[in-house]
Curated annotation (Swiss-Prot):
It comes from Methylobacillus flagellatus (strain ATCC 51484 / DSM 6875 / VKM B-1610 / KT). This is Putative manganese efflux pump MntP. Keywords: Cell inner membrane, Cell membrane, Ion transport, Manganese, Membrane, Transmembrane, Transmembrane helix, Transport. It is found in: Cell inner membrane. Probably functions as a manganese efflux pump. One of its GO terms (cellular component) is plasma membrane. It is a multi-pass membrane protein. It comes from the Bacteria. The chain crosses the membrane at residues 3-23, 41-61, 62-82, 103-123, 132-152, 167-187. InterPro entries: Mntp/YtaF, Put_MntP.
Length: 189
């Protein structure tokens, strides 16, 4: 793959993570650059790892992986989205302080859910005999940058109440998961 194709692929793979990061940033109380970079690093490492895993699995069991990857992504994102939406809907009218950071587990689960499509790309690249390491590295770096920017953009958009942001963020995650599932089931671009 040439550099332009690699960068375009990396941008495409980071789009879901960017959208999730905006909602994560909006839920935080004035996230600082360090929190944005921490979130970006978590997403970037996971997003870079999944095409490597996909490429490895593609060498061994492509049919099985591609048959289930979209269901895994949908399940993770739907679970997280429903959890966020429920949390936003069940508030009891009390003003809730926004937290200063998200837990590692929550960020890693969200990153994993948004990176399952990168695993599929890894499977596909295994059949094309493409060196996966530079591609995975580019995906990780671009995702780290996009997610860090997304968290900071979420800070700007985060003036809405925490509950509204949780509901919107949850619906975004459910939407991303549903779109991944739809694309795989119906072959939409």
């Amino acid at each position: 793959m040439n550099i332009v194709s690699t960068l375009l692929l990396a941008l495409a793979m980071s789009a879901d993570a960017f959208a999730a990061a905006v909602s994560k940033g909006a839920m935080l109380h004035r996230p600082r650059i360090i929190e944005a970079l921490r979130t970006g690093m978590i997403f970037g490492v996971i997003e870079a790892t999944t095409p490597l895993v996909g490429w490895s699995l593609g060498r061994v069991a492509a049919d099985y992986v591609t048959a289930w990857d979209h269901w895994i992504a949908f399940s993770i994102l739907a679970f997280l989205g429903i959890r966020m939406t429920w949390s936003g809907l069940k508030h009891d009218g009390k003003v809730v302080e926004k937290s200063r950071s998200h837990s590692f587990i929550l960020l890693a689960m969200t990153a994993l859910g948004t990176s399952i499509d990168a695993m599929s790309v890894g499977v596909s690249l295994a059949f094309l005999d493409i060196d996966i390491v530079p591609v995975a590295f580019a995906i990780g770096i671009v995702t780290c940058i996009m997610v860090s920017a997304g968290v900071m953009l979420g800070r700007v958009l985060g003036s809405a109440s925490k509950h509204t942001v949780e509901i919107i963020g949850g619906l975004i995650l459910i939407g991303i998961g549903s779109l991944i599932l739809y694309k795989h089931l119906y072959g939409a671009a």
